[in-house]
Amino acid sequence: MCVIFPVEIDVSQTVIRDCHVDEQTRELVYINKIMNTQLTKPVLMMFNISGPIRSVTRKNNDLRDRIKSKVDEQFDQLEREYSDKIDGFHDNIQYFKDEHYSVSCQNGSVLKSKFAKILKSHDYTDKKSIETYEKYCLPQLVDKHNDCYVAVCVLKPGFENGSNQVLSFEYNPIGNKVIVPFAHEINDTGLYEYDVLAYVDSVEFDGKQFEEFVQKLILPSSFNDSEKVLYYNEASKNKNMIYKALEFTTESSWVKSNKFNWKIFCNGFIYDKKSKALYVKLHNVTSTLNKNVILDMIK
């Protein structure tokens, strides 16, 4: 999940799609729809990506709904209303510029050493935001061990108008890896809020990584005395599912002996073995874990 400045900008739930294009190329769609009626100054956002960007295009807002529906459909199948049972290029940096946006992609080490200069090349000069980014964001974005690429995006006033508020990035992944950018800026509380949906195709299943993520999820607070938060690690012929859900029991209004068991707020990872596609839903949950998911590609 990228970091956005200024912080008063209101954005919708993050929606991510990362898909295979050809043997050397993937397409990342990263959507943080701006909800404010009008931008009065540029908006800065950054996120990790597993290779250099080769092109940037704007796409129609309808794409967000199509991706969201695809992910929601998978998780809706987990939830039930009734059950009989509850289970336990300057400086060698390439820039992509348009009237309403500016994008660059560079190694983390390059971004760290030339941070202010790169932002100036994007016509971004908000001193307070730059200082905050250097303190809270760069340590999370720049991995000294892997030196991941970082996409820098500046959205300019006017970007929020019209029907093409979605940016699509074609990039060349390095090391046969796909980075799903969930990481946040570092904060003083050590607790991170997630509200993101993601669809990623042509990747390997990574149960260990998904288990770590789900086990640390904190679901919304309780509203029923019989409520339980249960952890699932299930496998079927076609799917692997690792998720948490909120489950509780209610009594029938007509026959007191009848019990209704509910499963809601399913959050986690669903992997389709046949299509080799990953579906992720982290909706209004918190966690002490703050990291990206990094997956092996299937070519």
Swiss-Prot record:
Disulphide bridges in this chain? none
- Which InterPro entries does UniProt cross-reference here? Baculovirus_p35 (IPR003429), Baculovirus_p35_sf (IPR036562)
GO function term, MF aspect, one: cysteine-type endopeptidase inhibitor activity
Q: Name one GO biological process term.
A: negative regulation of apoptotic process
Q: Which domain of life is it from?
A: Viruses
Reply yes or no: does the keyword Lipid biosynthesis apply.
Answer: no
Its family remark reads: Belongs to the protease inhibitor I50 (p35) family.
Per the entry, what this protein does is: Blocks the insect or worm host cells apoptotic response initiated by the viral infection. Confers protection from cell death in mammalian cells. Acts by blocking the activity of members of the caspase family of proteases.
This chain's protein is named Early 35 kDa protein
Give the species this sequence originates from: Bombyx mori nuclear polyhedrosis virus (BmNPV)
State the gene name recorded for this protein.
P35
